[in-house]
Amino acid sequence: MRSIRSFANDDRHVMAKHSIIYPSPEELEAVQNMVSTVESALKQVSDWIDEQKCTKIENGSPIKNESTEDSSAKDESGKVLCGVMRIGLVAKGLLIKDDMDLELVLLCKEKPSTRLLTTVAENLPLQIQKITEETFQVEQCVEESSLLIQSSKEPKLTLKVILSSPLFREEEERPGGVENVAMKDPPDLLDRQKCLNALASLRHAKWFQARANGLKSCVIVLRILRDLCNRVPTWAQLKGWPLELICEKAIGTCNRPLGAGEALRRVMECLAFGTLLPGGSGLHDPCEKEPTDALAYMTVKEREEITHSAQHALRLLAFGQIYKVLQMDPLPSNKPFQKYSWSNSDREGSCLKRPFDDGSSDEKDPNKKLKRNLSKILDSKPIDPNQPMNALMRLNQIRPGLQYKLLSQSGPVHAPVFTMSVDVDGTTHEASGPSKKTAKLYVTVKVLQAMGYPTGFDTDLECLSSDEKSDSEGKNETSFSSSSNITGNSNADNNTLEVRTQGPILTASGKNPVMELNEKRRGLKYELISESGGSHDKRFIMEVEVDAQKFKGAGPNKKVAKASAALAALEKLFSGPNAVNNKKKKIIPQTKGVVSTAVSAAVQAARGRGRVAMARGAFVGATAAAAPGYIAPGMRREEMHPEIFNGYAAPYAYSAATPAYGIPKRMVLLPVMKFPAYPVPHYSFF
């Protein structure tokens, strides 16, 4: 299946060709004026004929009775000319330049005769003069059962008025085709087949207005194919009613609206499939009661030639050469990513391809082939810091074609350090990071800062893991401090923080905010509150509840928004005067020895990865649950704390967590003791 972009390119070419072949507003206005004038004049002619008929009846029968009055009323109710209807291109809206055939059908009560045609032709110019000052030439064409009306002003238009009657159709539908004896045809009756064709055209116009006019791109494709039929002799036999049926079937059977380019391709597919060939599906005429083939007039050779031409056109469409099918010049490439319009001086003399450079120039810049005149544009258009692009994208706009080089890779396998460099105007900038992408981003920010551009860009670091983000600051010599990395504000009312940074979001201690908050309050749940913006500028808001308080964070992706929410919670609850009161509360169960509390703290310190558990004392409550403690063998309780343990002996080296005499329930116990030199076991009892 072709991509949407190729269909969009086809749409551009089809619509450009359609604008070329579509009539000008002056031509459409002239068509409307001419058709409206002739319709009004024919109505005046109908009234004049009825008046003449009534006058003859009155002169032929001066004595009137009730029966004659009734008959005259019936004659007045049934006029000689019943009405005028638009058919063909005017009714269907398929007019194109150099192909503006205007047709009307004048319906008569009785079968039209040559005498009636002459009467209308003689009186029509007189009625036209009463309506408009413009002159029209009216010619009588008995062979075609019609009148030809030509305009005298530019553009030159020709309107064909065909006389017909519904009696021809009724006569065809009668069994045997026997006409009523009382109704005899006039001797100068007009051509029967021409009148039947006019009635068929009237049915075609009504069917087209009901079925094809509502289909998207159907009328546009029909105008394009009508132009193709005029240009290519092979397609001339398909012009008209069969072409309209094929387009309606091809476009109407799709389960979704089609663009102009895709609709044209679908019609070509139906023709290339072999619909017209003998033994194919054929083309049924929906406006006939009996099964009728709309392609019965075409020969086998003509069908094969049209099928072959459609197959060739379909190949051209598949290879993006629709301009050859339409016989037009290819349109210039329409690049959606080009956001800036070039000036007239830059546009003149420019070509689609990059000019050939033989290297004879004295410039020593290796990137001269890739540079563009963006410096003038950036000087005229200041950089918007709110634009959703990171530092790498912005530097690529300012200086396209920069070459980033990997200088070195150091560190262990599990924690490598990459050093990237870039040369800008003879100055080499270097930066390190835990990955090539991060190092490249850091050196880009460094270059932008050196050039004096603001660096408050949104950066998408989805590919970086949280561990990589938290470790990168400790390993990178050129990493920025937390005060320069984090540019945001926390609101005390709604506890919302939005961080805009070019690197990973870190706390003051150099850790990931989510990890540090998880150390202080485990089991937190982050929820997505809202998601806004388009596909190129997303905005996510995450919320987390800590100690019955809700904190929100916003960012270009969920990970950044989550880190922003965690950072807001840390700044509100664990910074400044609230840091001591809101530290993580580890409830130590009641043990059978004070030594066990200290030993357990030491064990926790030995197990943790640099997390010193002895930084604060363990809170011992009076309601704590009992748990066993650990006492090194060979040590007596009385030797460690005789002021506490004397008189409170317990079997199996267990003792109470607190002495018998009263002490505060929330007292912090800081025992002074000597720990054994041998290793502490790697387990704890809480």
UniProtKB/Swiss-Prot annotation:
Compositional bias (Low complexity): 477-491
Name of this chain's protein = Spermatid perinuclear RNA-binding protein
Q: Keyword Glycoprotein: yes or no?
A: no
Main function: May be involved in spermatogenesis and sperm function. Binds to double-stranded DNA and RNA.
The residue ranges of the DZF domain are 5-360
RNA-binding among the record's keywords?
yes
Q: Where in the cell is it found?
A: Cytoplasm
Query: Where does this protein have compositionally biased stretches of type Basic and acidic residues?
Result: 345-368, 466-476
Provide the alphabetized UniProt keywords. Answer: Cytoplasm, Developmental protein, Differentiation, DNA-binding, Repeat, RNA-binding, Spermatogenesis
Output a single Gene Ontology CC term carried by this record: precatalytic spliceosome
Q: Do you know which Gene3D superfamilies this protein is assigned to? A: 1.10.1410.40, 3.30.160.20, Beta Polymerase, domain 2 (3.30.460.10)
> Where mainly located?
cytoplasm
Gene behind this protein? strbp
The record's Pfam families line, in alphabetical order, gives: dsrm (PF00035), DZF_C (PF20965), DZF_N (PF07528)
Q: Which domain of life is it from?
A: Eukaryota
Q: Which GO terms describe its molecular function?
A: DNA binding; double-stranded RNA binding; single-stranded RNA binding
Among SUPFAM superfamilies, the record links this protein to: dsRNA-binding domain-like (SSF54768)
Ranges where the record places region Disordered = 339-368, 464-498
| Disulphide bonds in the chain | none
Domain named DRBM: residues: 387-453, 509-575
Provide a GO biological process annotation: spermatogenesis
Q: Which CDD domains match?
A: DSRM_STRBP_rpt1
